[in-house]
UniProtKB/Swiss-Prot annotation:
This is 3-isopropylmalate dehydratase large subunit. Keywords: 4Fe-4S, Amino-acid biosynthesis, Branched-chain amino acid biosynthesis, Iron, Iron-sulfur, Leucine biosynthesis, Lyase, Metal-binding. It comes from the Bacteria. It comes from Marinomonas sp. (strain MWYL1). CDD domains: IPMI. The lineage of its organism: Bacteria, Pseudomonadati, Pseudomonadota, Gammaproteobacteria, Oceanospirillales. Its EC number is 4.2.1.33. The keyword Lyase applies. Catalyzes the isomerization between 2-isopropylmalate and 3-isopropylmalate, via the formation of 2-isopropylmaleate. One of its GO terms (biological process) is L-leucine biosynthetic process.
Length: 475
């Protein structure tokens, strides 16, 4: 009998019941909640006269709708100008109070993007099953956890039963072998992976990311990679537990303490795929082939290295791809442009659940230090992923570096990742964004999003257009 993959181990250890139709009942260790997908779930509990099965297994924080300017944040919920956003945040506060669920509200320094808060609090732990009404819950797979997004009705189901009906995915291994080049980050790695396998390449799979190129990443970097597994079509992204994982978790508020810590670490050592484990699909990418990446179109798979020409629709042999490229060219306003450096940027956004952790901000600050934002740029904002990230960055003086360069230093939240708060693109505006999606209208109606790493976004803010950060930092 062959060994088990990490995904198999996590699945089997949480299997409550296997059903004849191929579905299974899976136990859920942690549910993260935010203001957008939880109101209907709580209302469902209320109408049915139910209580949460285990309140200690849920953690909430508002993130999608919260304003990020200091002026608006001083008043807490009352500072939210949009009435719908205000209702959603207020409703989360009320629901958490009524049902006894821990919430880091807008006035709590621990508030932030749910996928930043869970790990930094140690609420996300190796070996767990983690769900949230948000597709980027795959982020938590960086800890050797089985994590994925769920719908609102499923949010209610988990609140009521602490279980979920699921169908098991197949196993895919994406191995990044070798050593990454200077200034090539986790964001470049995952964009290159999506470019290679496509946005449907991981459909039906749980992707385990491995190889020396992945193992060399910090936990912040690993979270970036797993965060975008969903953009490759996979609900689940996983990375095996190692010393890097354990060191990150150690001492965090929700992490085990004392003898429980020692017992946990011993158990976590098995959270790796067995050497003889069989994967349904294996993809191998050479780390040294990965260069700084930039998306040019309206899908994460429309991505190229900074030094490559923008692909043209007329050069595509596949008629479906040709049509998609033509639409993307028109939407993105690329006529007359051949290289990414030809695109004049309007705004730069450094933040989101993909790239708003302290490591991301340190890298961006390193690039902009002693420089000034391009005069052609309308706006450049830096939005930390949580109040604790913000406090740490300010302790290190990173906010002073950003502000001296002309970037705005904001309060924590999802911000310009999506057009659900005051931070948006105008129609026809181009952004260099460290977020995870570049669909039509994602950052605002008619907005044109280019996904990049924090280093590339920082360099673009100074240059006013896309440049290779490797060349940029030399001058």
């Amino acid at each position: 009998m062959s060994g088990k993959t990490l995904y198999d181990k996590l699945w089997d250890s949480h299997l409550v019941q296997q059903r004849d139709d191929g579905s299974a009942l899976i136990y859920i260790d942690l549910q993260l909640l935010h203001e957008v997908t939880s109101p209907q779930a709580f209302e469902g509990l209320r109408l049915a006269g139910r209580k949460p099965w285990r309140v200690s297994s849920s953690l909430a924080t508002p993130d999608h709708n919260v304003p990020t300017t200091k002026k608006e944040r001083i008043s807490g919920v009352d500072g939210i100008e949009d009435p719908v956003s205000k209702i959603q945040v207020t409703t989360l506060d009320d629901n958490c109070n009524e049902f006894g669920i821990t919430e880091f509200n807008m006035k709590d320094i621990r508030q932030g993007i749910v996928h930043v808060v869970g790990p930094e609090q140690g609420a996300t732990l190796p070996g767990m099953t983690v769900v949230c009404g948000d597709s980027h819950t795959s982020t938590h797979g960086a800890f050797g956890a089985l994590a994925h997004g769920i719908g609102t009705s499923e949010v209610e189901h988990v609140l009521a039963t602490q279980c979920l009906v699921q169908k098991k995915s197949r196993n895919m291994l994406v191995r990044v072998d070798g050593e990454l080049s200077p200034w090539v980050s986790a964001k470049d790695v995952v964009l290159a992976i999506i470019g290679a396998i496509g946005t449907a390449g991981g459909t039906g799979y749980a992707i385990e990311f491995g190889g020396t190129g992945i193992q060399s990443l910090s936990m912040e970097g690993r979270m970036t990679v797993c965060n975008m597994a969903i953009e490759a079509g996979a609900r689940v992204g996983l990375i095996a537990v190692d010393d890097t994982t354990i060191e990150y978790v150690k001492g965090r508020p929700y992490a085990p303490k004392g003898e429980h810590w020692e017992m946990a670490v011993e158990a976590w050592k098995d959270l790796v795929s067995d050497k003889d484990a069989q994967f349904d699909e294996v993809v191998v990418i050479k780390a040294e082939d990965i260069k700084p990446q930039v998306t040019w179109g309206t899908s994460p798979e429309m991505v190229i290295a900074i030094d490559e020409p923008i692909p043209r629709a007329e050069d595509q042999k596949d008629p479906v791809k040709k049509e998609g490229y033509a639409r993307a060219w028109k939407y993105m306003g690329l006529e007359g442009k051949s290289m990414l450096s030809d695109i004049v940027l309007d705004r730069v956004f450094i933040g989101s659940c993909t790239n708003s952790r302290i490591e991301d901000l340190r890298i961006a600050a390193q690039v902009v230090k002693g420089r000034k934002v391009a005069s052609t740029l309308k706006q450049a904002i830096v939005v930390p992923g949580s109040g604790l990230v913000k406090a740490q960055a300010e302790k290190e003086g990173l906010h002073e570096i950003f502000e001296a360069a002309g970037l705005e230093w904001r309060e924590p939240g999802c911000s310009m990742c999506l057009a659900m708060n005051a931070d948006k693109l105008g129609a026809g505006e181009h952004s260099a964004s460290t977020s995870n999606r570049n669909f039509e209208g994602r950052q605002g109606f008619g907005g044109r999003t280019h996904l990049v790493s924090p280093a590339m976004a920082a360099a673009a803010a100074i240059a006013g257009h896309f440049v290779d950060v490797n060349e940029f930092v030399k001058h």
